[in-house]
UniProtKB/Swiss-Prot annotation:
PROSITE patterns: BPL_LPL_CATALYTIC (PS51733), LIPB (PS01313). The lineage of its organism: Bacteria, Pseudomonadati, Pseudomonadota, Alphaproteobacteria, Rhodobacterales. This is Octanoyltransferase. Belongs to the LipB family. One of its GO terms (molecular function) is lipoyl(octanoyl) transferase activity. Its EC number is 2.3.1.181. It catalyses: octanoyl-[ACP] + L-lysyl-[protein] = N(6)-octanoyl-L-lysyl-[protein] + holo-[ACP] + H(+).
Length: 220
């Protein structure tokens, strides 16, 4: 498996072309699986379920059609984007399990920083409860999204992946309704008061990956 960390900001079109080529190579047995960690310049992406009404400021940043699952999301500096190109044909062919493992990977990574990430029924991604914010009118803790997940499969090879908010400009999310959810906000590790660097997150991601996914099964 190739584990790649790109410096600088990678244009979205370049990343998409690289993913497309790598997915084809993996499916044809010409290349190993790949995990690609990068940052994008500020942009919005629209998944296959995106509602145009959720793009509330269409002129703010470039908007790209992503052809992944999900709705609108934001990518930009300070956010760790992780493109996950795994051969699910050799890992069980279970899409639901794959998405659950993506969530579990993020949750384990956050736990390295003593942050409790949680799943929520009907809301893909990873959420944190905000003890530091006023409770809702119903007396419940507010919840903010810290990581988004959106994937696609081609010939049982995954691509696209996840993003974790490390230290992005959270105001940049205001041009969309993130993931179509209006009643919850977004947060980041730094917003939660943690002096975490991108390099710290990268180390935690790699440590937790094999614990969550395991190595590629060896064919007999």
């Amino acid at each position: 498996m190739d584990w790649i960390i790109s410096d600088g900001l990678v244009p979205y079109e370049d990343a998409l072309a690289t993913m497309e080529a790598r997915v084809a190579a993996i499916s044809e047995g010409r290349a190993p699986e790949m995990i690609w960690l990068l940052e994008h310049p500020p942009l919005y992406t629209a998944g296959t379920s995106a509602d145009p009404a959720d793009l509330t400021d269409p002129d703010r940043f470039p908007v790209h059609t992503a052809r992944r699952g999900g709705q609108y999301t934001y990518h930009g500096p300070g956010q760790r984007v992780v493109y996950v190109m795994l051969d699910l044909g050799k890992r069980g062919r279970d899409v639901r399990q794959f998405v659950c493992r993506m969530e579990a990977w993020v949750i384990a990574t956050l736990a390295e920083f003593n942050v409790t990430g949680e799943r929520r029924e009907g809301r893909v991604g990873v959420w944190v409860q905000r003890q530091d914010k006023p409770r809702t009118a119903a007396g419940q803790l507010q919840e903010d999204k810290i990581a988004a997940i959106g994937v696609r499969l081609r010939k049982w090879v995954s691509f696209h992946g996840l993003s974790i908010n490390v230290e992005p400009d959270l105001d940049h999310f205001s041009g969309i309704v993130p993931c179509g959810i209006t009643e919850h906000g977004v947060t980041s590790l730094v917003d939660l008061g943690l002096p975490v660097t991108m390099a710290d997150v990268d180390v935690a991601l790699r440590k937790c990956f094999e614990e969550t996914f395991g190595p590629l099964p060896v064919e007999a």
